[in-house]
From Swiss-Prot:
Residues 297-356 bind DNA. Belongs to the POU transcription factor family. Class-2 subfamily. Residues 195-269 form the POU-specific domain. It comes from Homo sapiens (Human). Isoform 3 is B-cell specific. Isoform 5 is expressed in B-cells and the immunoglobulin-expressing T-cell line MOLT-4, but not in the T-cell line BW5147. This is POU domain, class 2, transcription factor 2. PROSITE patterns: HOMEOBOX_1, HOMEOBOX_2, POU_1, POU_2, POU_3. Residues 416-425 have a biased composition (Gly residues). Residues 76-85 have a biased composition (Pro residues). GO terms for biological process: cellular response to virus; humoral immune response; positive regulation of interleukin-6 production; positive regulation of transcription by RNA polymerase II; regulation of transcription by RNA polymerase II.
Amino acid sequence: MVHSSMGAPEIRMSKPLEAEKQGLDSPSEHTDTERNGPDTNHQNPQNKTSPFSVSPTGPSTKIKAEDPSGDSAPAAPLPPQPAQPHLPQAQLMLTGSQLAGDIQQLLQLQQLVLVPGHHLQPPAQFLLPQAQQSQPGLLPTPNLFQLPQQTQGALLTSQPRAGLPTQAVTRPTLPDPHLSHPQPPKCLEPPSHPEEPSDLEELEQFARTFKQRRIKLGFTQGDVGLAMGKLYGNDFSQTTISRFEALNLSFKNMCKLKPLLEKWLNDAETMSVDSSLPSPNQLSSPSLGFDGLPGRRRKKRTSIETNVRFALEKSFLANQKPTSEEILLIAEQLHMEKEVIRVWFCNRRQKEKRINPCSAAPMLPSPGKPASYSPHMVTPQGGAGTLPLSQASSSLSTTVTTLSSAVGTLHPSRTAGGGGGGGGAAPPLNSIPSVTPPPPATTNSTNPSPQGSHSAIGLSGLNPSTGPGLWWNPAPYQP
């Protein structure tokens, strides 16, 4: 039972094997016929080139396309087998004509490939699977057919072998001619980008030199704008010139302004050189007349360095209003012009007045006046106030000695005034000369020193007739 069951599948398996052998015998015979003689080799190009031919070989292509099954493969090569003895003469003529037609078709195909670039791909994609489905023996023939393609055109070899990749290759090639047309603006732009830094550097350098030369020539930014408007017809404001010097304009506007400013600067410099005047103020006058502007002049602005400014501040603190000789000495020490130093001191005094409206200069004599004239402010000072009072008494003692004759003449009047006003005022008047002559002896006591000072002041500054009566009314201050 086991043997019978095993024998049945062997029989069944042998049947398809025999069928396959029968199917393989026919292509083997066909391949043998292809190998036997060169005549059969010419038949295969006929079958192969027939899909590409249009006029006479169209029926053969239809037959191959209508027989996609494998059974028609052995039936197709059967008709040329009985005609083998007549092949050496008839097929040679056919092959010559077919080769000429193939060459023409190849040239047409090359034109199609070269001009559009991708029209050959769909027929190549359809013909290759048809050759694979119809006969496996025709698979090497496309390689034989591609040999003349390789010799005649290198583009045909790469495109039919790879259908989809060729689309990826040919599509980027299509934008290449399109890119070639907009390339001139793109070629102009990339060099502009590397040139921009150099242009910016040139603009920065020109802006610096323009500002320096403009200041040397004595022009303001408004003068430049008006002069350019009258000379070249383009009115520019002062802010435009200042923004150009500060590099605050756009790149295009800077490039537009640069040639105009260069031209104006050259004209102004030529006029200043032709005028041959030493000072920049005088240089500006002919150029202003050349520009057609009114005779407005501007002095050159001087910049003072920090160390020079510190030295001037020190000298200002020492003396706020120096004389012309002192100004000349300061100018020589600092290597500056005398006029510049004089103007600086004037400006510094004005600045001091703005900062301190009540300056310290008039306040200096004011503290001495109340101390000398009012006894109420002098007496409560204590020991600290004795020093200035002693100095005042010592300085005023000289006036008392020089005016001793005047004091002798004033005693009767004071006694008379004292008798009229009150009898108690006469004894202090007699004691005044005894107190004032020895100032060092009376400096130890606080009370006599103010009296001596007041007596001296009364003798020197006040009216003798009215002074004693006013100053000696406060009697309670005496011990």
